[in-house]
């Protein structure tokens, strides 16, 4: 499709699509406590979505660009689902969250197409991909406009990967009983097979959100990174998240001996937030296939089993959980009962001795992941390492933590 036609298709106003905040209809909407965390951002008054500035900046978005897009959304006088929430403009038009972030992404996509230097063009494509991902955030099931933005994010990511250092391969893995899934294998310079980090991302992120992790931390150490979307989103959208949360990653892990670029004898799993649920499950179920497991702000028990803690997290995050579980119309009580089944302690795993070395990093007073969560993980391992990460300065401490975790992973892979 030509650039002009793509623009016309993208930015033609459409009003029949449901607005994101209406997709999950839970019944007990309460008052919203103030929440701020490094990995999830903060719930800012008058916004439905959590504003995750740190992670967006970490992925390469300029803070001024974030403010510019937010300003366009705030200034819109278009009809909203909720007059009190800026990012609930109805229809695909000016002021709508998905429209404005996609419009910003298109500007970078056009720059990428016009740039003759492959390296700079690749950077612009990567920037566009990150912006399209923000447009699709928080990736709720049935959000048609967000799914279109996600498709554009994936396309931009593929374009970026062709131009940036290292090598990227898009790989299909067959999963018994359902559709195959697509993963991205990021390889550093040099000859493989490479020691590999299997990324297990959070429920509100996509596999294309982690290029920075590969480029800054893993690639310099000669490690490859294999990413896979969590069940129910992105390339794994045909799979529903179940209590067997590690199902997709487990099948991919088992298939690695057949991937010539991966040294399947040197694989580590790294989980962010709910991705740690997947990674720690793998530590128990696939111990012979993993050298180690690292977690950051894990969600493996407390948030899944403690109704008081669930009451302190923002509306959007509960909507994400309900969406992933396919419980779009569930009451909070029904959601709590189901979430409890996802606790690895309730499942009888955590608390039992695990032979896999496990590291877990935490922030004090993290509303999503208390210190006890990380202690439970590391004390269950025969070789556990607990890492406390100071909150301020946020960006520097996040970078330092990732460097330390990468060093620990590298040591386990040697």
Curated annotation (Swiss-Prot):
Pfam families assigned: FrsA-like (PF06500)
Protein name, UniProt field: Esterase FrsA
EC number(s) given by UniProt: 3.1.1.1
Organism domain of life: Bacteria
Chain's role: Catalyzes the hydrolysis of esters.
Family of the protein in this entry: Belongs to the FrsA family.
Signal peptide: none
Residue intervals passing through the bilayer: none
PANTHER family: DIENELACTONE HYDROLASE DOMAIN-CONTAINING PROTEIN-RELATED, ESTERASE FRSA
NCBIfam families named among the record's database cross-references: PRK05077.1
Single GO molecular function: carboxylesterase activity
InterPro entries from the UniProt entry: AB_hydrolase_fold, FrsA, FrsA-like, FrsA_esterase
Organism this protein belongs to: Citrobacter koseri (strain ATCC BAA-895 / CDC 4225-83 / SGSC4696)
UniProt keyword terms in alphabetical order: Hydrolase, Serine esterase
Keyword hit for Iron: no
Catalysed conversion reaction: a carboxylic ester + H2O = an alcohol + a carboxylate + H(+)
């Amino acid at each position: 499709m030509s650039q002009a036609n793509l623009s016309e298709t993208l930015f033609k106003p459409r009003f029949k699509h449901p607005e994101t905040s209406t997709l999950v209809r839970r019944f007990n909407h309460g008052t919203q406590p103030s929440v701020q965390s490094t990995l999830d951002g903060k719930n800012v008054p008058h916004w439905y979505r959590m504003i995750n500035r740190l992670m967006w900046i970490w992925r390469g978005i300029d803070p001024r660009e974030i403010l510019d897009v937010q300003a366009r959304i705030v200034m819109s006088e278009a009809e909203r689902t909720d007059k009190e929430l800026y990012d609930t403009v109805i229809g695909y038009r000016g002021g709508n969250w998905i429209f404005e972030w996609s419009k910003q992404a298109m500007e970078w996509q056009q720059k990428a197409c016009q740039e003759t230097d492959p390296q700079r063009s690749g950077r612009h494509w990567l920037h566009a991909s990150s912006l399209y991902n923000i447009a699709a955030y928080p990736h709720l099931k049935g959000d048609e406009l967000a799914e279109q933005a996600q498709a554009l994010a994936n396309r931009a990511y593929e374009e970026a990967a062709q131009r940036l250092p290292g090598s990227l391969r898009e790989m299909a893995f067959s999963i018994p009983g359902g559709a195959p899934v697509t993963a991205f294998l990021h390889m550093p310079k040099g000859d493989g097979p490479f020691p590999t980090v299997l990324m297990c991302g959070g429920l509100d992120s996509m596999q294309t959100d982690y290029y920075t992790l590969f480029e800054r931390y893993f690639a310099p150490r000669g490690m490859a990174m294999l990413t896979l979307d969590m069940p129910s989103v992105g390339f794994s959208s045909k799979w529903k998240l179940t209590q067997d949360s590690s199902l997709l990653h487990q099948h991919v892990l088992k298939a690695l001996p057949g991937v010539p670029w991966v040294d399947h004898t040197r694989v580590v799993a790294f989980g962010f937030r709910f991705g740690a649920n997947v990674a720690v499950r793998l530590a128990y179920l696939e111990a012979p296939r993993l050298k180690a497991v690292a977690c950051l702000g894990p969600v493996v028990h407390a948030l899944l089993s403690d109704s008081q803690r669930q009451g302190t997290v923002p509306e959007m995050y509960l909507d994400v959980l309900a969406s992933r579980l396919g419980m779009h119309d569930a009451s909070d009580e029904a959601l709590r009962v189901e979430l409890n089944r996802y606790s690895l302690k309730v499942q009888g795993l955590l608390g039992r001795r695990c032979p896999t070395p496990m590291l877990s990093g935490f922030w004090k007073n993290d509303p999503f992941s208390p210190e006890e969560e990380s202690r439970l993980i590391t004390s269950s391992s025969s070789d556990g390492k607990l890492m406390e990460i100071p909150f301020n300065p946020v960006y520097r401490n996040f970078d330092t933590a990732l460097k330390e975790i990468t060093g620990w992973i590298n040591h386990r892979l040697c």
